[in-house]
Amino acid sequence: MNSLDLPKPPHETRVVVAMSGGVDSSVVAGLLKREGYDVVGVTLQLYDHGAATHRKGACCAGRDIHDARAVAETLGIPHYVLDYEDRFRESVIDRFAESYLSGETPIPCVECNRSVKFRDLLGMARDLGAEALATGHYVASRAQPEGGRALYRALDPARDQSYFLYATTPEQLAFLRFPLGERPKDETRALARELGLAVADKADSQDICFVPQGGYADVIAKLRPEAARPGEIVDLDGRRLGEHEGIIHYTVGQRRGLKLSVGEPLYVVRLEPETARVVVGPRAALATRRIRLTDLNWLGSRAPDGLADLPVAVRVRSTREPRPARLSWNAAEACLEVELVVPEDGVSPGQACVIYADDGPRAQVLGGGTIRRIGALQAGAAEAA
């Protein structure tokens, strides 16, 4: 087997590298080229939203396509640019806006990986005669004794991107390779300099690439003008405390920007899109123990519909470490339920709940799903649909 766990020698193995124009994917292309693989670079043009294409840290547009092409020329590999703007708008941006209108807090990166990068790009790689698609993500995949590949957290915990890749299917994992999963970020930049890549010191991309200056509400309002529907801010008992200019400006757990003159700190507990109400309460009202998941992607060896009180670890936000939990299958609702051992604050519908075999630094990813329903501890913060 070669370094990618493929049977042919590198010079007989074609690998397509998804090149975003950043340092990580550029280093992947450079490393594989140096090892003798037949490397083909592919860059997706996903959007071109004016200010977003020029801001520092944006990705997948204008300047980044130029950088990816320049790296390919430096390495002496063929490079193709594929126009996926329409697909990206339909699969990612429009869904992002609809999710916010529904009172959720979506993660467009998960949908982009699931609906665009790892579906369409993977198919394109096969059309080009490749035996693998390599990316610059910080996540690890390893061959399993029983066959197939499993997904694991990256060596560098500060860069681990497994939270955003939980929706990768077993079939996709078999074709994907993540050469940086076993490397720290500092080593990646050093390799970029060693390879003579002009992007060695380029800033890392932002999570939401199509949102200029972090103003996601402006993007949503432009796509869906009805999103700026004003409404009331109420407490847990329904008492009116103030007004707002649209629920798209709020997310569960938010404290800043409420503009309320009350004696105690208040947080957004839930959003009610039907009534356009923002419900606020004390921090204790955010404590969540039970989570119900939909759009489940399961990577574990045991079928999810047979699970009962399985000990695992879960992440309910990308910035948090995995926490102990237990999984059970709800046969009546045909969905997976998560019970957190220690209640968590700020659990929001629309976010991902990613499931790991344990809370270790190199834990296996068992799967995950979209948080659709939460069970809060506070009496006044009853289950929100």
UniProtKB/Swiss-Prot annotation:
Keywords: ATP-binding, Cytoplasm, Disulfide bond, Nucleotide-binding, RNA-binding, Transferase, tRNA processing, tRNA-binding. It catalyses: S-sulfanyl-L-cysteinyl-[protein] + uridine(34) in tRNA + AH2 + ATP = 2-thiouridine(34) in tRNA + L-cysteinyl-[protein] + A + AMP + diphosphate + H(+). Its EC number is 2.8.1.13. One of its GO terms (biological process) is tRNA wobble position uridine thiolation. Pfam families: tRNA_Me_trans, tRNA_Me_trans_C, tRNA_Me_trans_M. GO terms for cellular component: cytoplasm. The record marks H137, Q351 as: Interaction with tRNA. It is found in: Cytoplasm. Disulfide bonds join C112-C209. SUPFAM superfamilies: Adenine nucleotide alpha hydrolases-like. Residues 159-161 are annotated as: Interaction with tRNA. The active site is at C112 (nucleophile), C209 (cysteine persulfide intermediate). ATP binds at A18, M19, S20, G21, G22, V23, D24, S25, L44, G136. Signal peptide: none annotated. GO terms for molecular function: ATP binding; tRNA binding; tRNA-uridine 2-sulfurtransferase activity. Its main location: cytoplasm. Catalyzes the 2-thiolation of uridine at the wobble position (U34) of tRNA, leading to the formation of s(2)U34. Belongs to the MnmA/TRMU family. This is tRNA-specific 2-thiouridylase MnmA. It comes from Methylorubrum populi (strain ATCC BAA-705 / NCIMB 13946 / BJ001). The gene is mnmA.
